Amino acid sequence: YRRKLFRLRDPYDIEASQDLFLQAVRENCAYHYAHCGEYRAILEHFHFSPETLRCETDLARLPALPTAFFKGREIYSMPRGRQLVRATSSGTKGQMSRIGFDAGGLLCGLEMVVRIAQRHSLFSVRPAHYILLGYKPHRGNQTAVTKTAFGATLFTPALSRTYALRY
């Protein structure tokens, strides 16, 4: 369902996406429930299971995991070998949370970004100078915000990339 949701022709079509969204959340919840003991324990503590997600109003019952939870521990639902891209939070308070993306998740995200960029005419062959309000990417900086900011410069050929922050 995730792939179908991310491949919708019109990303803003609520009617077409509502049922797919619910099914994708249920599918995602079931995956993490089956592959991550820590996540399963949290859901069970709140008497929640993926099958509980039957209608849109059930989404509000899905236990939220605060950012602080991930800063204090590393939990994964997939082996590190399947994580093609790893990123961290900025760690502004001294602790970073970590996330990994597999090929399927990256492809879904890329397809949606391309679809939205096309819809808003963001692609161009005309070169541009980019000013990024963030850090320049390098091996020591694995923050997701840096990777995302760099990705935003791929919509049109870059004449230059100027970064506002120094690492």
Features from the language model and the residues they span:
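N-terminal leader/targeting and accessory segments in enzymes
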Residues: 1-55
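Active-site phosphate/ATP/adenylate-binding loop shared across adenylate-forming ligases
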Residues: 1-19, 60-167
